[in-house]
Protein backbone atom coordinates (compact mmCIF):
# COMPACT_ATOMS: atom_id res chain seq x y z
CA UNK A 1 0.00 0.00 0.00
CA UNK A 2 1.33 3.40 -0.92
CA UNK A 3 0.93 6.37 1.40
CA UNK A 4 1.33 10.06 0.78
CA UNK A 5 4.34 10.93 2.95
CA UNK A 6 4.11 14.60 2.03
CA UNK A 7 0.60 14.84 3.47
CA UNK A 8 1.68 13.05 6.65
CA UNK A 9 4.65 15.36 7.08
CA UNK A 10 2.46 18.42 6.56
CA UNK A 11 0.11 17.12 9.27
CA UNK A 12 3.11 16.47 11.53
CA UNK A 13 4.39 20.01 10.99
CA UNK A 14 0.97 21.44 11.85
CA UNK A 15 0.74 19.33 15.01
CA UNK A 16 4.22 20.43 16.11
CA UNK A 17 3.23 24.07 15.64
CA UNK A 18 0.10 23.48 17.74
CA UNK A 19 1.99 21.60 20.44
CA UNK A 20 0.30 18.27 19.69
CA UNK A 21 3.51 16.27 19.96
CA UNK A 22 1.91 12.84 20.40
CA UNK A 23 -0.06 13.18 17.15
CA UNK A 24 2.98 14.59 15.36
CA UNK A 25 5.04 11.61 16.50
CA UNK A 26 2.46 9.17 15.13
CA UNK A 27 2.53 10.86 11.73
CA UNK A 28 6.34 10.80 11.64
CA UNK A 29 6.47 7.13 12.66
CA UNK A 30 3.97 6.29 9.94
CA UNK A 31 6.28 7.94 7.42
CA UNK A 32 9.33 6.08 8.73
CA UNK A 33 7.50 2.75 8.71
CA UNK A 34 7.07 3.27 5.00
CA UNK A 35 10.33 5.12 4.30
CA UNK A 36 12.89 4.68 7.10
CA UNK A 37 15.38 7.13 5.60
CA UNK A 38 12.99 10.03 5.30
CA UNK A 39 15.09 13.00 6.41
CA UNK A 40 12.16 15.28 7.25
CA UNK A 41 10.57 12.71 9.55
CA UNK A 42 13.81 12.28 11.53
CA UNK A 43 14.16 16.06 11.70
CA UNK A 44 10.59 16.48 13.00
CA UNK A 45 11.13 13.77 15.62
CA UNK A 46 14.22 15.67 16.74
CA UNK A 47 12.20 18.86 17.16
CA UNK A 48 9.54 16.95 19.12
CA UNK A 49 12.18 15.43 21.40
CA UNK A 50 13.71 18.87 21.94
CA UNK A 51 10.30 20.28 22.93
CA UNK A 52 9.95 17.45 25.44
CA UNK A 53 13.51 17.95 26.76
CA UNK A 54 14.50 14.47 25.63
CA UNK A 55 17.93 15.71 24.60
CA UNK A 56 19.54 12.34 23.91
CA UNK A 57 16.77 11.40 21.50
CA UNK A 58 16.86 14.85 19.89
CA UNK A 59 20.60 14.53 19.25
CA UNK A 60 20.11 11.08 17.76
CA UNK A 61 17.33 12.27 15.43
CA UNK A 62 19.16 15.37 14.21
CA UNK A 63 22.36 13.38 13.69
CA UNK A 64 20.41 10.87 11.61
CA UNK A 65 18.97 13.73 9.55
CA UNK A 66 22.37 15.27 8.76
CA UNK A 67 23.89 11.87 8.04
CA UNK A 68 21.13 11.26 5.50
CA UNK A 69 21.44 14.78 4.10
CA UNK A 70 24.67 16.59 5.06
CA UNK A 71 23.35 19.80 3.48
CA UNK A 72 20.28 19.99 5.74
CA UNK A 73 21.04 23.37 7.32
CA UNK A 74 18.12 23.42 9.76
CA UNK A 75 19.06 20.01 11.15
CA UNK A 76 22.61 21.23 11.80
CA UNK A 77 21.18 24.33 13.46
CA UNK A 78 18.87 22.39 15.76
CA UNK A 79 21.61 19.91 16.57
CA UNK A 80 23.65 22.91 17.70
CA UNK A 81 20.72 24.14 19.81
CA UNK A 82 20.51 20.81 21.64
CA UNK A 83 24.23 20.81 22.34
CA UNK A 84 23.94 24.41 23.52
CA UNK A 85 21.11 23.57 25.93
CA UNK A 86 23.13 20.66 27.33
CA UNK A 87 26.24 22.83 27.83
CA UNK A 88 28.24 21.08 25.14
CA UNK A 89 29.49 24.32 23.66
CA UNK A 90 32.24 22.97 21.40
CA UNK A 91 29.81 20.53 19.78
CA UNK A 92 27.23 23.30 19.47
CA UNK A 93 29.80 25.50 17.79
CA UNK A 94 30.81 22.75 15.37
CA UNK A 95 27.17 22.22 14.41
CA UNK A 96 26.58 25.93 13.86
CA UNK A 97 29.71 26.16 11.71
CA UNK A 98 28.40 23.25 9.62
CA UNK A 99 25.15 25.14 9.13
CA UNK A 100 26.94 28.39 8.26
CA UNK A 101 29.13 26.65 5.71
CA UNK A 102 25.92 25.77 3.86
CA UNK A 103 24.03 29.03 4.40
CA UNK A 104 26.49 31.84 4.99
CA UNK A 105 23.94 34.65 4.78
CA UNK A 106 21.64 33.44 7.56
CA UNK A 107 21.48 35.98 10.44
CA UNK A 108 19.91 33.49 12.86
CA UNK A 109 22.87 31.14 12.41
CA UNK A 110 25.32 33.96 13.06
CA UNK A 111 23.41 34.96 16.18
CA UNK A 112 23.36 31.39 17.54
CA UNK A 113 27.08 31.03 16.82
CA UNK A 114 27.71 34.32 18.60
CA UNK A 115 25.84 33.10 21.68
CA UNK A 116 27.92 29.91 21.77
CA UNK A 117 31.15 31.87 21.40
CA UNK A 118 30.05 34.31 24.10
CA UNK A 119 29.42 31.44 26.50
CA UNK A 120 32.93 30.19 25.72
CA UNK A 121 34.25 33.72 26.50
CA UNK A 122 35.45 34.19 22.93
CA UNK A 123 34.49 37.85 22.93
CA UNK A 124 36.03 38.82 19.59
CA UNK A 125 34.42 35.88 17.81
CA UNK A 126 31.04 36.61 19.36
CA UNK A 127 31.22 40.28 18.35
CA UNK A 128 32.04 39.32 14.76
CA UNK A 129 29.08 36.94 14.61
CA UNK A 130 26.62 39.46 16.03
CA UNK A 131 27.88 42.06 13.59
CA UNK A 132 27.30 39.63 10.73
CA UNK A 133 23.81 38.97 12.07
CA UNK A 134 22.86 42.66 11.93
CA UNK A 135 24.59 42.98 8.55
CA UNK A 136 22.19 40.45 7.05
CA UNK A 137 19.24 41.51 9.21
CA UNK A 138 19.55 45.20 10.18
CA UNK A 139 16.57 44.97 12.56
CA UNK A 140 17.92 42.05 14.59
CA UNK A 141 17.45 43.70 17.99
CA UNK A 142 18.66 40.70 20.02
CA UNK A 143 22.02 40.92 18.25
CA UNK A 144 22.27 44.65 18.98
CA UNK A 145 21.43 43.96 22.62
CA UNK A 146 24.15 41.32 22.92
CA UNK A 147 26.65 43.56 21.13
CA UNK A 148 25.89 46.28 23.65
CA UNK A 149 26.53 43.86 26.52
CA UNK A 150 29.87 42.72 25.08
CA UNK A 151 31.03 46.27 24.42
CA UNK A 152 30.10 47.17 27.97
CA UNK A 153 32.06 44.22 29.36
CA UNK A 154 35.13 45.24 27.37
CA UNK A 155 34.95 48.88 28.45
CA UNK A 156 33.85 50.23 25.05
CA UNK A 157 31.15 52.40 26.56
CA UNK A 158 30.38 54.60 23.55
CA UNK A 159 29.77 51.59 21.32
CA UNK A 160 27.81 49.89 24.08
CA UNK A 161 25.51 52.88 24.31
CA UNK A 162 25.11 53.10 20.52
CA UNK A 163 24.09 49.45 20.23
CA UNK A 164 21.70 49.71 23.19
CA UNK A 165 20.03 52.76 21.65
CA UNK A 166 19.64 50.85 18.39
CA UNK A 167 18.04 47.91 20.20
CA UNK A 168 15.60 50.22 21.99
CA UNK A 169 14.72 51.98 18.73
CA UNK A 170 13.69 48.59 17.35
CA UNK A 171 11.99 47.37 20.55
CA UNK A 172 10.82 50.47 22.45
CA UNK A 173 8.40 48.48 24.63
CA UNK A 174 10.80 45.66 25.51
CA UNK A 175 11.71 45.53 29.21
CA UNK A 176 14.95 43.67 28.56
CA UNK A 177 16.42 46.24 26.19
CA UNK A 178 15.16 49.13 28.32
CA UNK A 179 16.96 47.61 31.30
CA UNK A 180 20.13 47.20 29.26
CA UNK A 181 20.06 50.82 28.13
CA UNK A 182 19.24 52.03 31.64
CA UNK A 183 22.14 50.08 33.11
CA UNK A 184 24.56 51.66 30.64
CA UNK A 185 23.25 55.14 31.42
CA UNK A 186 23.74 54.38 35.10
CA UNK A 187 27.37 53.27 34.61
CA UNK A 188 28.08 56.41 32.58
CA UNK A 189 26.61 58.63 35.30
CA UNK A 190 23.48 59.64 33.36
CA UNK A 191 21.22 58.83 36.28
CA UNK A 192 18.13 60.72 35.11
CA UNK A 193 18.19 58.94 31.76
CA UNK A 194 18.71 55.61 33.54
CA UNK A 195 15.75 56.25 35.84
CA UNK A 196 13.58 57.17 32.85
CA UNK A 197 14.44 53.85 31.15
CA UNK A 198 13.65 51.80 34.24
CA UNK A 199 10.44 53.68 34.97
CA UNK A 200 9.27 53.11 31.40
CA UNK A 201 10.03 49.40 31.82
CA UNK A 202 7.98 49.39 35.04
CA UNK A 203 5.02 50.95 33.24
CA UNK A 204 5.17 48.00 30.86
CA UNK A 205 5.60 45.41 33.63
CA UNK A 206 5.10 46.78 37.12
CA UNK A 207 6.18 43.65 38.99
CA UNK A 208 9.43 43.01 37.11
CA UNK A 209 12.04 42.33 39.81
CA UNK A 210 14.95 42.98 37.45
CA UNK A 211 13.68 46.48 36.71
CA UNK A 212 12.85 47.22 40.34
CA UNK A 213 16.32 46.14 41.44
CA UNK A 214 17.97 48.18 38.69
CA UNK A 215 15.93 51.20 39.71
CA UNK A 216 17.05 50.73 43.29
CA UNK A 217 20.64 50.43 42.09
CA UNK A 218 20.59 53.70 40.17
CA UNK A 219 19.09 55.51 43.15
CA UNK A 220 21.90 54.05 45.26
CA UNK A 221 24.42 55.36 42.73
CA UNK A 222 22.71 58.75 42.93
CA UNK A 223 22.84 58.61 46.74
CA UNK A 224 19.06 58.61 47.24
CA UNK A 225 19.13 55.89 49.88
CA UNK A 226 15.43 55.95 50.77
CA UNK A 227 14.33 55.34 47.18
CA UNK A 228 17.10 52.81 46.65
CA UNK A 229 15.85 50.78 49.60
CA UNK A 230 12.20 51.20 48.61
CA UNK A 231 12.56 49.72 45.13
CA UNK A 232 15.01 47.03 46.24
CA UNK A 233 12.71 45.82 49.00
CA UNK A 234 9.75 45.93 46.63
CA UNK A 235 11.62 43.48 44.40
CA UNK A 236 12.25 41.22 47.41
CA UNK A 237 8.57 41.35 48.39
CA UNK A 238 7.63 40.13 44.91
CA UNK A 239 10.36 37.49 44.75
CA UNK A 240 11.83 36.79 48.21
CA UNK A 241 14.71 34.72 46.85
CA UNK A 242 15.81 37.18 44.15
CA UNK A 243 19.57 37.23 44.64
CA UNK A 244 20.55 40.58 43.02
CA UNK A 245 18.02 42.46 45.16
CA UNK A 246 19.40 40.97 48.39
CA UNK A 247 22.95 41.78 47.27
CA UNK A 248 21.99 45.38 46.53
CA UNK A 249 20.14 45.70 49.83
CA UNK A 250 23.31 44.63 51.62
CA UNK A 251 25.24 47.41 49.90
CA UNK A 252 22.52 49.96 50.73
CA UNK A 253 22.58 49.04 54.41
CA UNK A 254 26.37 48.96 54.60
CA UNK A 255 26.90 52.32 52.90
CA UNK A 256 24.33 53.74 55.34
CA UNK A 257 26.30 52.35 58.30
CA UNK A 258 23.60 49.81 59.18
CA UNK A 259 26.01 47.01 60.05
CA UNK A 260 23.48 44.99 62.03
CA UNK A 261 21.44 44.22 58.93
CA UNK A 262 24.16 44.87 56.38
CA UNK A 263 26.65 42.21 57.45
CA UNK A 264 23.92 39.59 57.62
CA UNK A 265 22.60 40.48 54.18
CA UNK A 266 26.15 40.62 52.81
CA UNK A 267 26.23 36.81 53.00
CA UNK A 268 23.98 36.81 49.92
CA UNK A 269 27.12 37.57 47.94
CA UNK A 270 27.80 33.82 47.80
CA UNK A 271 24.67 33.35 45.71
CA UNK A 272 25.86 35.79 43.04
CA UNK A 273 27.69 34.63 39.94
CA UNK A 274 30.88 36.57 40.70
CA UNK A 275 31.29 35.10 44.16
CA UNK A 276 30.27 31.55 43.30
CA UNK A 277 33.46 31.30 41.25
CA UNK A 278 35.57 31.85 44.39
CA UNK A 279 33.44 29.83 46.80
CA UNK A 280 35.22 27.09 48.76
CA UNK A 281 33.46 23.76 49.11
CA UNK A 282 35.12 22.70 52.33
CA UNK A 283 33.73 19.77 54.25
CA UNK A 284 34.62 21.53 57.49
CA UNK A 285 31.82 23.68 58.92
CA UNK A 286 31.60 27.44 58.65
CA UNK A 287 32.60 29.20 61.87
CA UNK A 288 29.69 31.06 63.47
CA UNK A 289 31.74 33.26 65.78
CA UNK A 290 31.33 31.07 68.86
CA UNK A 291 34.14 30.16 71.23
CA UNK A 292 35.99 27.04 70.05
CA UNK A 293 39.20 27.00 72.13
CA UNK A 294 40.24 23.53 70.93
CA UNK A 295 39.66 24.18 67.23
CA UNK A 296 41.82 25.43 64.37
CA UNK A 297 40.18 28.09 62.19
CA UNK A 298 41.09 28.82 58.57
CA UNK A 299 40.33 32.42 57.59
CA UNK A 300 40.60 32.92 53.85
CA UNK A 301 40.60 36.16 51.86
CA UNK A 302 38.01 35.79 49.14
CA UNK A 303 38.30 39.16 47.42
CA UNK A 304 41.05 41.52 46.25
CA UNK A 305 44.26 42.71 47.84
CA UNK A 306 42.68 45.93 49.06
CA UNK A 307 39.84 44.03 50.73
CA UNK A 308 42.34 41.71 52.40
CA UNK A 309 44.38 44.62 53.75
CA UNK A 310 41.25 46.35 55.01
CA UNK A 311 39.68 43.36 56.76
CA UNK A 312 42.66 41.57 58.33
CA UNK A 313 42.15 44.06 61.16
CA UNK A 314 39.30 41.82 62.37
CA UNK A 315 41.57 38.80 62.85
CA UNK A 316 42.84 40.20 66.13
CA UNK A 317 39.33 39.89 67.58
CA UNK A 318 39.18 36.21 66.67
CA UNK A 319 42.33 35.40 68.62
CA UNK A 320 40.62 34.70 71.96
CA UNK A 321 37.74 32.69 70.47
CA UNK A 322 39.58 29.77 68.84
CA UNK A 323 42.65 27.68 69.54
CA UNK A 324 44.68 28.25 66.38
CA UNK A 325 44.32 30.53 63.35
CA UNK A 326 45.52 29.89 59.81
CA UNK A 327 45.20 32.98 57.62
CA UNK A 328 45.20 32.74 53.83
CA UNK A 329 45.96 35.97 51.94
CA UNK A 330 47.10 36.84 48.40
CA UNK A 331 50.76 36.03 47.78
CA UNK A 332 51.50 39.68 47.01
CA UNK A 333 50.92 40.68 50.66
CA UNK A 334 52.01 37.43 52.34
CA UNK A 335 55.24 38.93 53.67
CA UNK A 336 53.57 42.03 55.11
CA UNK A 337 50.76 40.08 56.75
CA UNK A 338 53.09 37.44 58.17
CA UNK A 339 55.07 40.14 59.92
CA UNK A 340 52.08 42.17 61.10
CA UNK A 341 49.16 39.93 62.05
CA UNK A 342 49.29 37.66 65.09
CA UNK A 343 48.19 34.26 63.80
CA UNK A 344 49.67 30.79 63.95
CA UNK A 345 50.30 30.47 60.23
CA UNK A 346 49.96 32.63 57.12
CA UNK A 347 49.58 30.94 53.75
CA UNK A 348 48.80 31.93 50.17
CA UNK A 349 46.33 30.30 47.77
CA UNK A 350 47.61 26.95 46.56
CA UNK A 351 49.73 26.31 49.65
CA UNK A 352 49.04 23.40 51.96
CA UNK A 353 46.93 24.79 54.78
CA UNK A 354 47.55 21.98 57.27
CA UNK A 355 44.58 20.59 59.16
CA UNK A 356 41.78 22.88 60.24
CA UNK A 357 38.42 22.29 61.90
CA UNK A 358 36.46 25.39 60.90
CA UNK A 359 36.68 28.00 58.19
CA UNK A 360 35.34 31.44 57.38
CA UNK A 361 35.78 33.93 54.51
CA UNK A 362 37.60 37.06 55.63
CA UNK A 363 34.74 39.46 54.89
CA UNK A 364 32.34 37.29 56.89
CA UNK A 365 34.27 38.05 60.09
CA UNK A 366 32.30 41.23 60.92
CA UNK A 367 29.05 39.24 60.78
CA UNK A 368 30.46 36.40 62.89
CA UNK A 369 31.82 38.82 65.50
CA UNK A 370 28.59 40.87 65.68
CA UNK A 371 27.19 42.08 68.07
CA UNK A 372 29.93 41.49 70.67
CA UNK A 373 32.40 43.44 68.54
CA UNK A 374 30.17 45.69 66.47
CA UNK A 375 32.45 48.69 66.04
CA UNK A 376 35.12 49.10 63.37
CA UNK A 377 38.57 48.31 64.80
CA UNK A 378 40.58 51.33 63.69
CA UNK A 379 43.84 51.13 65.59
CA UNK A 380 46.44 52.11 63.01
CA UNK A 381 49.01 51.21 62.00
CA UNK A 382 48.16 47.53 62.10
CA UNK A 383 50.62 46.67 59.35
CA UNK A 384 54.35 47.05 59.87
CA UNK A 385 57.53 46.36 57.93
CA UNK A 386 60.05 43.58 58.49
CA UNK A 387 63.40 45.03 59.58
CA UNK A 388 65.10 43.78 56.41
CA UNK A 389 62.40 45.16 54.11
CA UNK A 390 64.41 48.14 52.82
CA UNK A 391 67.29 46.18 51.21
CA UNK A 392 68.76 49.38 49.79
CA UNK A 393 65.55 50.49 48.09
CA UNK A 394 65.37 53.87 49.81
CA UNK A 395 69.01 54.75 49.24
CA UNK A 396 68.61 54.01 45.51
CA UNK A 397 65.84 56.60 45.08
CA UNK A 398 66.66 60.21 44.26
CA UNK A 399 64.87 61.93 47.14
CA UNK A 400 64.41 65.68 47.30
CA UNK A 401 64.82 65.85 51.06
CA UNK A 402 64.13 69.56 51.24
CA UNK A 403 60.73 69.20 49.58
CA UNK A 404 57.36 67.80 50.62
CA UNK A 405 57.20 64.27 49.18
CA UNK A 406 53.89 63.09 47.68
CA UNK A 407 53.20 59.63 46.26
CA UNK A 408 50.48 59.41 43.61
CA UNK A 409 48.28 56.66 42.15
CA UNK A 410 45.71 57.43 39.45
CA UNK A 411 44.42 54.04 38.32
CA UNK A 412 43.24 50.81 39.91
CA UNK A 413 42.64 47.30 38.67
CA UNK A 414 41.39 47.61 35.07
CA UNK A 415 39.29 44.47 35.59
CA UNK A 416 37.30 46.06 38.41
CA UNK A 417 33.66 46.56 37.43
CA UNK A 418 33.75 50.25 38.39
CA UNK A 419 37.24 51.01 37.08
CA UNK A 420 35.90 53.35 34.39
CA UNK A 421 34.56 55.56 37.18
CA UNK A 422 37.06 55.20 40.00
CA UNK A 423 40.29 55.53 37.97
CA UNK A 424 41.28 58.85 36.41
CA UNK A 425 43.89 60.17 34.01
CA UNK A 426 47.33 61.23 35.21
CA UNK A 427 46.71 64.57 33.49
CA UNK A 428 44.51 65.63 36.42
CA UNK A 429 47.52 65.49 38.72
CA UNK A 430 49.48 67.93 36.56
CA UNK A 431 47.57 70.83 38.08
CA UNK A 432 49.17 69.96 41.41
CA UNK A 433 52.68 69.89 40.04
CA UNK A 434 52.99 73.63 39.74
CA UNK A 435 52.75 74.00 43.51
CA UNK A 436 56.24 74.93 44.74
CA UNK A 437 58.04 72.86 47.34
CA UNK A 438 56.60 69.46 46.36
CA UNK A 439 58.22 66.41 44.78
CA UNK A 440 55.92 63.80 43.26
CA UNK A 441 56.64 60.06 43.22
CA UNK A 442 54.62 57.66 41.09
CA UNK A 443 53.51 54.55 42.99
CA UNK A 444 51.44 53.45 40.01
CA UNK A 445 51.79 49.82 38.90
CA UNK A 446 50.21 47.90 36.05
CA UNK A 447 49.47 48.93 32.45
CA UNK A 448 48.64 52.54 33.37
CA UNK A 449 52.10 53.13 34.89
CA UNK A 450 53.55 53.94 31.45
CA UNK A 451 51.55 57.19 31.33
CA UNK A 452 54.14 58.82 33.54
CA UNK A 453 56.84 58.55 30.86
CA UNK A 454 55.12 61.12 28.64
CA UNK A 455 54.19 63.38 31.53
CA UNK A 456 57.68 63.34 33.02
CA UNK A 457 58.96 65.30 30.01
CA UNK A 458 57.09 68.40 31.18
CA UNK A 459 56.65 67.65 34.87
CA UNK A 460 59.07 66.40 37.49
CA UNK A 461 57.62 63.02 38.42
CA UNK A 462 59.85 60.38 39.95
CA UNK A 463 58.72 57.11 38.37
CA UNK A 464 59.18 54.29 40.90
CA UNK A 465 57.18 51.65 39.02
CA UNK A 466 60.23 49.56 38.09
CA UNK A 467 61.56 49.66 41.65
CA UNK A 468 58.33 48.52 43.31
CA UNK A 469 58.38 44.75 42.94
CA UNK A 470 56.01 44.00 45.81
CA UNK A 471 53.59 45.61 48.23
CA UNK A 472 56.38 45.47 50.79
CA UNK A 473 58.48 47.68 48.52
CA UNK A 474 55.57 50.09 48.16
CA UNK A 475 55.14 50.14 51.94
CA UNK A 476 58.84 50.93 52.41
CA UNK A 477 58.56 53.90 50.05
CA UNK A 478 55.37 55.12 51.74
CA UNK A 479 57.15 55.33 55.07
CA UNK A 480 59.43 57.93 53.50
CA UNK A 481 56.64 60.04 52.02
CA UNK A 482 54.79 62.93 53.61
CA UNK A 483 51.54 62.16 51.82
CA UNK A 484 49.92 59.62 49.48
CA UNK A 485 47.23 60.82 47.06
CA UNK A 486 45.40 57.91 45.46
CA UNK A 487 42.20 56.86 43.78
CA UNK A 488 40.36 53.88 45.31
CA UNK A 489 43.00 51.13 45.06
CA UNK A 490 44.83 48.62 47.22
CA UNK A 491 47.60 51.22 47.57
CA UNK A 492 45.20 53.52 49.41
CA UNK A 493 44.32 50.71 51.82
CA UNK A 494 48.00 49.95 52.33
CA UNK A 495 48.78 53.58 53.13
CA UNK A 496 45.87 53.76 55.56
CA UNK A 497 46.86 50.52 57.30
CA UNK A 498 50.40 51.91 57.72
CA UNK A 499 48.95 55.15 59.15
CA UNK A 500 50.56 57.15 56.35
CA UNK A 501 48.72 60.44 55.67
CA UNK A 502 46.47 59.63 52.72
CA UNK A 503 44.13 61.59 50.51
CA UNK A 504 41.61 59.32 48.84
CA UNK A 505 39.99 60.48 45.59
CA UNK A 506 36.53 59.00 45.06
CA UNK A 507 34.09 58.99 42.14
CA UNK A 508 30.53 60.13 42.77
CA UNK A 509 29.34 56.51 42.78
CA UNK A 510 31.90 55.19 45.23
CA UNK A 511 32.15 51.88 47.03
CA UNK A 512 30.02 51.18 50.11
CA UNK A 513 33.03 51.10 52.46
CA UNK A 514 33.57 54.85 52.16
CA UNK A 515 29.99 55.55 53.30
CA UNK A 516 28.15 58.76 52.38
CA UNK A 517 29.36 62.37 52.34
CA UNK A 518 32.18 61.80 54.83
CA UNK A 519 35.55 63.47 54.44
CA UNK A 520 37.11 61.12 56.97
CA UNK A 521 37.24 57.32 57.18
CA UNK A 522 36.39 55.25 60.25
CA UNK A 523 38.66 52.57 58.80
CA UNK A 524 41.77 54.72 58.56
CA UNK A 525 42.27 57.72 60.92
CA UNK A 526 45.10 59.09 58.73
CA UNK A 527 42.86 59.29 55.66
CA UNK A 528 41.06 62.28 54.21
CA UNK A 529 38.45 61.77 51.50
CA UNK A 530 37.80 63.97 48.47
CA UNK A 531 34.60 63.17 46.58
CA UNK A 532 33.24 64.07 43.17
CA UNK A 533 30.24 66.35 43.56
CA UNK A 534 28.73 65.05 40.32
CA UNK A 535 29.42 61.97 38.19
CA UNK A 536 32.65 62.11 36.22
CA UNK A 537 33.70 65.54 37.52
CA UNK A 538 37.37 65.09 38.34
CA UNK A 539 38.12 68.75 37.54
CA UNK A 540 36.25 70.14 40.56
CA UNK A 541 37.65 67.43 42.81
CA UNK A 542 41.24 68.25 41.84
CA UNK A 543 40.57 71.95 42.37
CA UNK A 544 39.74 71.08 45.98
CA UNK A 545 42.82 68.86 46.24
CA UNK A 546 45.02 71.64 44.85
CA UNK A 547 43.63 74.19 47.30
CA UNK A 548 44.05 71.80 50.24
CA UNK A 549 47.59 70.90 49.19
CA UNK A 550 48.60 74.57 48.99
CA UNK A 551 47.17 75.13 52.46
CA UNK A 552 49.03 72.09 53.78
CA UNK A 553 52.34 73.22 52.30
CA UNK A 554 51.96 76.75 53.63
CA UNK A 555 51.38 75.40 57.14
CA UNK A 556 54.26 72.90 57.04
Q: Which stretches of residues belong to each language-model region?
A:
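Alpha-helical solenoid repeat scaffolds of the TPR/TPR-like class and their adjacent stem/linker regions
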Residues: 1-483, 488-556
Amino acid sequence: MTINTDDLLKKAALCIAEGKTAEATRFCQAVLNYEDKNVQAHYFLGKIALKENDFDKAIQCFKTAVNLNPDYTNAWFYLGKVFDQTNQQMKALDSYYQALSRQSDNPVLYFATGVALQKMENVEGAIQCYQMAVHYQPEYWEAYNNLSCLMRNTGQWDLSLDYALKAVSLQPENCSVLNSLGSIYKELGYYRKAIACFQKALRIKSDDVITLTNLGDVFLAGRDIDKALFYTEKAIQIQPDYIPAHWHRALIWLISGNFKDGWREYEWRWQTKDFQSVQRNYTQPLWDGGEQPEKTLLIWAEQGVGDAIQFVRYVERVRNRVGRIILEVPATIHRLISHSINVDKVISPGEESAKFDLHIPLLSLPRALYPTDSDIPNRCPYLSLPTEADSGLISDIDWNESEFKVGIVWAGNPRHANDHNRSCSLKYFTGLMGIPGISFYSLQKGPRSTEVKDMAINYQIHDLSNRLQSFTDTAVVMQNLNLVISVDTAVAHLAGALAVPTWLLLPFNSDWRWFLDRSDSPWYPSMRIFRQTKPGDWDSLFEQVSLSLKQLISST
